[in-house]
């Protein structure tokens, strides 16, 4: 798989850009702020419909423009398809394949696959659990594109349920009074000093007219519990399976990247927000999630937030030998070099797993060599040199290892010029 042509309109710093590409290694060389990363970011966006640099689409649209367009001719198994996404901040994005509109923009996900190495990768090791969950989910969606819908459904359910919990909390639900019951909750009596029913001057139960009655709120919460368990169980089951598939690749990649620098083994383990007691099947996980939600009901009502589900899980990264209890967490214990080696191992493992699935994803090395010492630069270059397409960005040509010789573009002053 490789990108043969990239076309940008009002994307980041580019009013327009047209770049012809080829298989093998291509390096974009330019000073910081000249737009070299914007080029590879656009290709990665087509892969995941999200940026590895920012959380929202708004910064991706050039200042003063209403929308941005990214279009690429992608060659896969000898066939060329033109993929296009139209970014509309505040509105729905639109996607096309060979100029034919897709029902939903997310249907574009997975048609081109990328693996990005960037300076931000250190957050996979040193950042919050959310960074590691995103790493897993992005890889899940690349392998099984329909899971983009599952993840979107879970996020929607979580937002709705949190809103309802906050409403219930403001409405005066309390721990005492025996609120829990199987399949839902018994409504409590009014808080001390407050009459039963909606606040004075308000009627009904919409979000705009005031909080719903307690029985309505609790019955509605039971419905969202079921949605949370259903979508959460599917996402959780897929993550568990992914970690099992990824684990041997991480260990092998770390051993290669940190060659001679350590005798420790790199391990990854999935840590759910509660004890699964060995359950991994979807139906069993649905029951487990529902039971845990019921057990934590009081805490959730007290805090007004969902405390159970995949959004609270963690991907544990450890170094050492033996059982998980005998290994040390990378975050907080590993040196800077070990942390970088682990971050690179995660990306390399993702690349190797996608290749094992039968696809050779596009590798993007975004300013990553400037962060590595000479030995790690050479090791990484050796590992990725055989990929069908490798896109590299660097501030100076000297940052690109000799093992990654190939086409080069000079990027500056809004232009992308191929060097002869």
Swiss-Prot record:
UniProt-listed SUPFAM superfamilies: P-loop containing nucleoside triphosphate hydrolases (SSF52540)
Location of this chain's protein in the cell: Cytoplasm
Entries under PROSITE patterns matching the protein: RECF_1 (PS00617), RECF_2 (PS00618)
Protein name: DNA replication and repair protein RecF
GO molecular function: ATP binding; single-stranded DNA binding
Keywords: ATP-binding, Cytoplasm, DNA damage, DNA repair, DNA replication, DNA-binding, Nucleotide-binding, SOS response
Lineage, opening ranks: Bacteria, Bacillati, Actinomycetota, Actinomycetes, Propionibacteriales
Key word Signal present: no
Pfam families in the cross-refs: SMC_N
